[in-house]
């Protein structure tokens, strides 16, 4: 298309999140709509609709988002044909699969157990639709109709877990929907975190961005991971905000001969990183390689 459409989380002083929509003709300068396109309505999301990720399949937009009730961060689903009028389908994992909506101990062999984040792969694999989801560890689920999802494993058997001694040693989380590369592999941007020393004997969490590769012939496993993060907190916006030291990627689009990766900075602002789409990605923070905040997301 001739525009980039960005769905983003924003909140006012009450820190109750809504999802807004903004458009851009160049991928860097955005005009946002005055009213949110998705707001809390139900008990499971009464304190926020967060972390939007959208996939378009056969003219329908499938939006996964986090419903937050200040106890549990649930993976939820909504659909639309015009990006403005949405039908909410509620939490994705319920009933027998509600184990993914519990908040397990922070430090377990497999991290935390919120369903939270999710991305839908825009093409079928092995005759089914696939979703990757999870915060703490990454899991997979399949569907016949894109609305009803069945996890492929239990909470104790994730497909991807934190790597000891690495930038994601305490937490891994879904980033962007996978893209199919010329080599036939799916590449997905991810988020990782580790604890670092804080003040007065406490600790802080440092979020960085990674990548994993998945073979569509074996979509239930990670084939390879990037050993070093491609994006780390560096700028003032990355290191100062509602939650400090966070670069957190959620959107990826190919536009104008570039890959544009949209990421959050310390839960306060949004920015974009770019890579040349004609070759191997070498990420920079804006078209000229300099830091660039493109949209305030604080209400």
Predicted feature residues:
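Beta-rich carbohydrate-recognition and catalytic domains
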Residues: 1-47, 56-170, 179-242, 256-299
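Low-complexity, glycine/alanine/valine/leucine- and proline-rich hydrophobic stretches
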Residues: 244-247
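ATP/pyrophosphate-binding catalytic subdomain of soluble kinases
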Residues: 173
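Electrostatic interaction modules used in gene-expression and signaling proteins
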Residues: 252-254
